[in-house]
């Protein structure tokens, strides 16, 4: 009987849970790997990605009481017309600008908060 993938899969399908467990342990010992490693690596990778974030989306969460001032700042930041900027502010929460560098995002946030808006960086 030739050793090929179809034969291996057929044998695995016929094996019991205990036999498959023994197979996994034998493979781990033979090749120096663990079956649980990918889960731990994925979790660690996600934590690193959050710490190394260098671009943000600026989200207007609420316009506040001084809507006119917020609309002016939104027009300045985005280059939108009056109608589009008003719709964006009235439709809060919404993204004002996407993929902005950290320094620029902080500057935009400060301008909007100074105008009376509530802003988050995502």
UniProtKB/Swiss-Prot annotation:
One of its GO terms (molecular function) is mRNA binding. Forms part of the ribosomal stalk which helps the ribosome interact with GTP-bound translation factors. Is thus essential for accurate translation. InterPro entries: Ribosomal_bL12, Ribosomal_bL12_C, Ribosomal_bL12_C/ClpS-like, Ribosomal_bL12_oligo, Ribosomal_bL12_oligo_N_sf. Coiled coil: none annotated. Keywords: Ribonucleoprotein, Ribosomal protein. GO terms for biological process: translation. Gene3D superfamilies: 3.30.1390.10, Single helix bin. Homodimer. Part of the ribosomal stalk of the 50S ribosomal subunit. Forms a multimeric L10(L12)X complex, where L10 forms an elongated spine to which 2 to 4 L12 dimers bind in a sequential fashion. Binds GTP-bound translation factors. This is Large ribosomal subunit protein bL12. It holds the Pfam family Ribosomal_L12_N. CDD domains: Ribosomal_L7_L12. It comes from the Bacteria. One of its GO terms (cellular component) is cytosolic large ribosomal subunit. Belongs to the bacterial ribosomal protein bL12 family.
């Amino acid at each position: 009987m030739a050793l090929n993938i179809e034969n291996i899969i057929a044998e695995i399908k016929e094996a019991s849970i205990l036999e498959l467990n023994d197979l996994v342990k034998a493979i781990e010992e033979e090749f120096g790997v663990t079956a649980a490693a990918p889960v731990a690596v994925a979790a660690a990778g996600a934590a690193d990605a959050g710490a190394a974030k260098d671009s943000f989306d600026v989200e207007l969460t609420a316009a506040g009481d001084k809507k006119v001032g917020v609309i002016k700042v939104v027009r300045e930041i985005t280059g939108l017309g009056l109608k589009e900027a008003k719709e964006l502010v009235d439709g809060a929460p919404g993204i004002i600008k996407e993929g902005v560098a950290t320094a620029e995002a902080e500057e935009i946030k400060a301008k909007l908060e100074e105008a009376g808006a509530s802003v988050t960086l995502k």
